[in-house]
């Protein structure tokens, strides 16, 4: 039996150093802190960040460390106290919105933790506006749509764009969430097959690893309709080592699509919540989009629905660590401002300490 391990932490014929990337170093520290190796006291954790790699990093992403840096949001990539390195709050959940507006945020009486934005493959982002939002302490959730072909990404023909974007986000510095081609269930066939998506996702992550873009947190963002897609989710999933967060987009479709009944927050979130508990139990969950319209007489109101969502987050949906409301007039009127009661309820839950995480 092996009774001792001595790592060759040096640069010789190859660069074997554990600190070739932030992810590598965090993984090595987690290994060293495992009780199996705890035979002598460990030295204090260094206070400085590791140097960015000068050679390609490993193609896997270790599970984020539970010991965060102490930098506040907007100050260069660290995690504040009370958060893991993957920006998972140790308690409570992050609160966010799409279609950001400062006037509307002022109505809420607090800053949003997350602002959700959407970009195409060749876009240059974060934009100046997005950088300003991040500089004020908000986290960006960026949906990055592929060029229309997952095989083209997976086979390396899009590596130049991946490297360009990875270097830009590395230079940005702050922690951010990046979802590669969200809701891929909608594009199976046109963009490729489920296995192509998983390979493309891994190719993107590997490209970011190569340049040392350690501030980027990768989000696997599904629609979350288990009834129609549950059989393909295992093939779409790129693997735990490539995913920091799992996100899905549940909606209460009553009044927007024919044949849909009124459904509670617990009901719309349950199927995919249960699926992830069985297939990826260690990953934090995010509602990257969710919404409802005003509800019919005799049903719980939109305001009551919001208030109940906070109850569920505290009790039955404790693995959901971030929720981002789809505050848009899109295929339905999902806007919070559909009634004064809706605004008041949404404002009240946002001010609750459970959701008041970053600010």
Language model feature labels by segment:
Residues 1, 164, 169-170, 194-209, ...:
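Long, well-ordered alpha-helical scaffolding segments within enzyme catalytic domains
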Residues 1-3, 7, 128-145, 251-296:
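Glycoside hydrolase catalytic-domain groove-lining segments
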Residues 1-2, 8-33, 87-175, 301-305, ...:
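N-terminal carbohydrate-binding/catalytic regions of secreted carbohydrate-active enzymes
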Residues 4-10, 85-86, 97, 205-231, ...:
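Aromatic-lined carbohydrate-recognition surfaces of secreted/lumenal glycan-active proteins
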Residues 5, 165-195, 216-225, 246, ...:
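Active-site groove signature of glycoside hydrolases
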Residues 8-10, 112, 116-117, 233-263, ...:
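Aromatic- and acid-rich polysaccharide-binding/catalytic face
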Residues 43-81:
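Ser/Thr/Gly/Pro-rich low-complexity, disordered linker/stalk segments of secreted
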Residues 145-156, 183-194, 223-226, 248-265, ...:
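Surface-exposed cleft-lining segments at the edges of enzyme active sites
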